[in-house]
Amino acid sequence: MGSLSSSISSLFLKEFFGAFFLSMRYFFRQKATINYPFEKGPVSPRFRGEHALRRYPNGEERCIACKLCEAICPAQAITIEAGPRRNDGTRRTVRYDIDMVKCIYCGFCQEACPVDAIVEGPNFEFATETREELYFDKARLLDNGDRWEREIARNIAIDSPYR
């Protein structure tokens, strides 16, 4: 009896038609894929991408050279050199470098920063041809902050109830 039912199933191509109708059901639905370089999917506000140093609205850099991000970085990818104290008693950085080859994008630097100076922005397209280009200095980080400030501020505002 088993061989008779298997013969009938194979004769009528039961599995083939089942797979065909399943394919046809999904063929006419909306596509789940996107054409990547030309279309981009949504990015979460908590996405951790390329690092950036932010500025205050008056143009002054936010980093106060407390070195908390350097101390908490598990990959030891951040190097900070603080300048002398200013007349108002605050400090600013003379050197702020991040070795993106070492960075593991954990976000601890962003969480440790008391003034939201160092953030991981929404940019994920920063591939390079050499390793040296992945060594971000202070000028590059400030440029990233200026370029992505609107998106970074929006993401921080969206995420603020959970911080």
Curated annotation (Swiss-Prot):
EC number: 7.1.1.-
Keyword DNA-binding attached: no
Superkingdom as given in the UniProt entry: Bacteria
Residues engaged in binding [4Fe-4S] cluster 1: C63, C66, C69, C113
Pfam family, one: Fer4_7
One term under GO cellular component: plasma membrane
Main subcellular localisation: membrane
Membrane topology: Peripheral membrane protein
Keyword Nucleotidyltransferase appears in the UniProt entry: no
Reactions accelerated catalytically: a quinone + NADH + 5 H(+)(in) = a quinol + NAD(+) + 4 H(+)(out)
Classification via SUPFAM superfamilies: 4Fe-4S ferredoxins (SSF54862)
Gene3D superfamilies reported for this sequence: 3.30.70.3270
Protein's cellular compartments: Cell inner membrane
Matching InterPro entries: 4Fe4S_Fe-S-bd, 4Fe4S_Fe_S_CS, NADH_quinone_OxRdtase_chainI
Cofactor comment: Binds 2 [4Fe-4S] clusters per subunit.
Record: residues binding [4Fe-4S] cluster 2: C73, C103, C106, C109
Function comment: NDH-1 shuttles electrons from NADH, via FMN and iron-sulfur (Fe-S) centers, to quinones in the respiratory chain. The immediate electron acceptor for the enzyme in this species is believed to be ubiquinone. Couples the redox reaction to proton translocation (for every two electrons transferred, four hydrogen ions are translocated across the cytoplasmic membrane), and thus conserves the redox energy in a proton gradient.
Similarity comment: family membership: Belongs to the complex I 23 kDa subunit family.
Quaternary structure, from the entry: NDH-1 is composed of 14 different subunits. Subunits NuoA, H, J, K, L, M, N constitute the membrane sector of the complex.
Name recorded for this polypeptide: NADH-quinone oxidoreductase subunit I
Lineage of producing organism: Bacteria, Pseudomonadati, Pseudomonadota, Alphaproteobacteria, Hyphomicrobiales
